[in-house]
Amino acid sequence: MKTILLSIGLLAMASACSKWQNNQQQITKISTDGTWIISSYIDDGDDETTDFSTFRLHFMESGVLHGTDLLSSSSSPYEGTWSLTDSNSNDDSLDDLDFNMNFNVGNKLDDLSDDWDIISYTDTEIKLIDVSGGGGGTDYLTLTKQ
């Protein structure tokens, strides 16, 4: 009986890991395929989308994140990093998959630096949420493929 229960437990863990890896692979493929715009950014209830309307984001498979401001006279992109991590290995729900973005402090895109939870994703849209700890606010970010 113990062997059966152990086998069921191991099968459940393998299935959860497989589902998480499948989501991670899908989101990585979607993210790295094309140019993204910030179609919505709500910072603790304040709509700040227009502050980012001229930016284009490029997610590279290497984990590098390029941000380009169409109004900037500089040809140098804003450099950052991005990754996907499992914030809770106890289950395999989509909201346990973190979409991490980091830009240098003082960078125009620094407001986007966070470990965002994924609300939903399609081939052309990624919806993210971040609930700040310690009584902080809730931020929403929607990325749309251009």
Question: Where are each of the predicted segments found?
Answer:
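Lipid interaction determinants
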Residues: 18-146
